[in-house]
A protein has these predicted regions:
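Bacterial N-terminal signal peptides that target proteins for export
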Residues: 1-7
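Acidic, glycine/proline-rich low-complexity segments that act as flexible tails and inter-domain linkers
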Residues: 19-81, 110, 136-166
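Extended intrinsically disordered, low-complexity coil regions enriched in Ser, Thr, Gly, Ala
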Residues: 79, 96-119, 132-146
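Short, structured motif recognition centered on aromatic/hydrophobic residues
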Residues: 83-91, 101, 121-122
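Active-site-proximal catalytic alpha-helix in oxidoreductases
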Residues: 88-94, 130-131
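Acidic, glycine-rich active-site loops and adjacent beta-strand->loop/helix elements
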Residues: 123-129
Length: 166
């Protein structure tokens, strides 16, 4: 991110100080938006992840704040709950991202997603990503729910259509 900012500022030198000011304002706004969105979703957990990268890969932390949360998660068009459910789907499908999956299951609960929605999204991935990925996802959800003291009733009759939640 520092290199990108330096390149933008270098390009703006020919255009004058107003361009450089605008570029910095945009960068600062994106970072503020990213930090706010990350905090809304993860509480302090997201900041801890970013801070843990400062000694080895600070740029990765900046990308998480500025791009993932400052650009993508803060876009209009989808609620934070919907964004978290889609992220849970993707991380479940990957099958090898349990730490990140747990963070996003926690985040989904923080922004108002229902535990039953989270379970259904993970179950849906059994069809597309395979049963091992779905089993790993359910294990991650079980851990997050247990940590929060959440108990959900399993649906036992698949013939009963699911309730619409949105």
């Amino acid at each position: 991110m520092k290199l990108k900012t330096a390149l933008v500022l270098t390009g703006c030198m020919a255009a004058g100080p107003a361009c450089a000011d605008t570029a910095l304002q945009g960068q600062n706004a994106r970072q503020e938006r990213g930090e706010k969105t990350l905090a809304n979703i993860t509480g302090g957990a997201g900041k801890q992840v970013v801070d843990s990268l400062r000694d080895i890969a600070p740029d990765l932390g900046d990308w998480i704040i500025n791009f993932a949360y400052g650009e993508v998660f803060s876009r209009p068009g989808l609620s934070l709950c919907t964004r978290e459910l889609t992220t849970i789907s993707a991380l479940t499908a990957l099958g090898n991202a349990q730490p990140q999956l747990k963070v996003h299951i926690d985040g989904a609960l923080n922004v108002g997603c229902k535990p039953e929605e989270i379970v259904e999204v993970i179950l849906q991935m059994a069809v597309y990503a395979g049963f091992p990925s779905a089993l790993n996802g359910i294990g991650a959800a079980r851990e997050v729910f247990a940590k929060r003291g959440i108990k959900i009733a399993a649906r036992t009759d698949p013939a009963v259509p699911p309730q619409e939640t949105r």
